[in-house]
Amino acid sequence: FLRKLIDENLIPDDVKVQVLTQSREHLITKTFEALKGCKNAIVHLYNSTSVLQRDVVFNMDKEEIIGIAVKGAKLIKEEAAKYPETNFQFEYSPESFTGTEMDYALEICEAVMDVWQPTSENKMIINLPSTVEMTTPNRYADQIEWFSKTIKNRDCVSISLHPHNDRGTSTAAAELGLLAGADRIEGTLFGNGERTGNLDILIVGMNMYSQGVDPELDFSNINKIAEIYKDCTKLPIHERHPYVGD
């Protein structure tokens, strides 16, 4: 799919495509091969950081998990240098941020920052996902506010939200997270995602419009967007869905 977009010159000049990779060498290499010839791209690195995943899935201590992140960050920096024709922006996620100790989430993100050396002109994205929605939206916003105020070199970082919808509160979490200091949101069309889904970017965008804030998303042909979505995914949109329901 990505090769089709690049080879057929289907990506507008003002659009960045985003790719997601685990901190594994062969996946990082393949990811950059897929991006060859792309004008603008975000390369998004992630690894699991929560207490549960460290203890049960990886059986690793904190330093070993940081080592995984740093190794991946170095590989991405090395691979990006091989493709000077592409304007890369780097992104890092401590997966399961909401299940991670806040001081440790900060530590691992700053370790990645030390590798990538972002600047105010070339910011890196730090994405703080509620990989499994575990608590109330105000608690998520508290975590975002603390992180935003505590991270070093804040002017060199764009803080991103990635709310899942396990508790049915992803929209509230996203809106409160923005008010708490986040710069960016990741979401999906009509909430399509694993388990109970991810944040519906359309709802947040339309909610922002209703409050006089332009999300810089074009919803002028929202019914056509819905038709294409249903045709491509073979998934229905609930008739009581906000803004696009029947």
Where are these regions (language model features)?
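Alpha/beta enzyme core
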Residues: 2-12, 25-159, 175-180
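A glycine-rich helix N-cap at a beta->alpha junction
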Residues: 13-21
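Generic beta-strand/beta-sheet core signal
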Residues: 20, 46, 93-95, 127-129, ...
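Short glycine/serine/threonine-rich phosphate/pyrophosphate-binding segments
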Residues: 27-28, 166-172
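Short acidic (Asp/Glu) and glycine-rich catalytic loops that position anionic groups and cofactors
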Residues: 124, 182-186, 202-210
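Glycine-rich phosphate-binding active-site loops on the catalytic face of alpha/beta enzymes
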Residues: 180-199
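C-terminal helical cap(s) of enzyme catalytic domains, especially alpha/beta-barrels
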Residues: 193-225
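A mid-to-C-terminal "edge-of-domain" accessory segment
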Residues: 212-246
